[in-house]
């Protein structure tokens, strides 16, 4: 896909649109978008299940943008059911062109599909909530219906102080007190398109300049003066640990929990009861989860059991650590 050309009506054909299900009710509609590839279908499905369970008072219209997913996963998307939901899928028909040098830290290029969401939906919705697939909704999103976005491109949540300090050293010339985590974007669609954010974002990401945090940096640069900061409960970022159930502690007073870094809750070593609960509510409930993203976490867990004098558990995880070190690719 040539993302350098101007965005116009011809770009609508970049996606194959499929209306999977519609719901006719009198509830207020909340449009929610996810962007993913085959590696992130399952986590996204779990995120959707969590939103459905906690938002029975809204008509939830899910707009699912994806590239290169299996027929099995397409069928599972069809299996998502509830009386108050609508689902529309948008399958990318051309390869997404993104500067690979920018995609560091394991960031998939499908994350840049979020640049296109408000453009593709420009004739259909006034606002859309973009969410990353590694999020879990724990409470109602109903208050977003009344959020005033006038004069703002998007409502966002400030990133951690640590991330804002890192951003301040990157020389972007922005107010880093407003630096936000781009996993949550409640977008004013008309304002986004009037400012040509889609076109400018792709131009920046493919310019040859390397942005430390890729699309997140690009969006912060473009939206810095036109974003509205809202309560951190809508994007509570956490890093999981193999020796502590971090998400259980972080869930109190949280609306959306965001699992940042490579420590994701779909690895069994983190024992995320929150994720497992919503996984069981999704069409992906029979997924065989992997144990760990890397061997070192097994060693850390083994050492914790040793210090707690839980020798059986220590031996179990130390043996798994040796196995992973010897045989994992």
Regions inferred by a protein language model and the residue ranges of each:
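Short loop->beta transition adjacent to catalytic acidic/histidine clusters or analogous donor-positioning motifs
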Residues: 30, 55-63
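Histidine-anchored nucleotide/phosphate-binding helix
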Residues: 41-55
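Short alpha-helix within the catalytic core of nucleotide-sugar-dependent glycosyltransferases
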Residues: 75-78, 123, 138-149, 198
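Short aromatic/hydrophobic "clamp" motif used to bind/position activated sugar donors
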Residues: 128
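Short internal beta-strands
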Residues: 61-68, 155-158
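Active-site-proximal specificity loops/subdomain of glycosyltransferases
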Residues: 75, 79-120
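A glycosyltransferase accessory/donor-loop signature
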Residues: 1-30, 36, 187-189, 193-329
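Conserved donor-nucleotide/metal-binding helix-loop-beta segment in metal-dependent transferases, i.e.
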Residues: 135-170
